[in-house]
């Protein structure tokens, strides 16, 4: 590591019910582990609470997924999209540098 670090280090706790992201010993994201995807394109539409609110109340072409079951990743694509979406929540709160994914 050099004199200046232009990245943020974060910790992610993937849970079956909630996903938590910690930065500088503070919880910065605590959202339900849910994603909403377009059935036709597999495009990510919503993550976390926004996706949970869409469950059962949206168009038939939108599906909500809980990517973790019994503490294990059950849908790798949905889990990846969920992590990417939640990391974006962290970087939107910090205007300088994006988080470092390791």
Which sequence ranges carry the predicted segments?
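Short, surface-exposed beta-edge/turn micro-motifs
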Residues: 7-8, 32
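A short acidic-Thr-Gly-centered motif at the start of a beta-strand
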Residues: 1-5
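Conserved phosphate-binding loops in N-terminal lobes of ATP-dependent enzymes
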Residues: 16-102
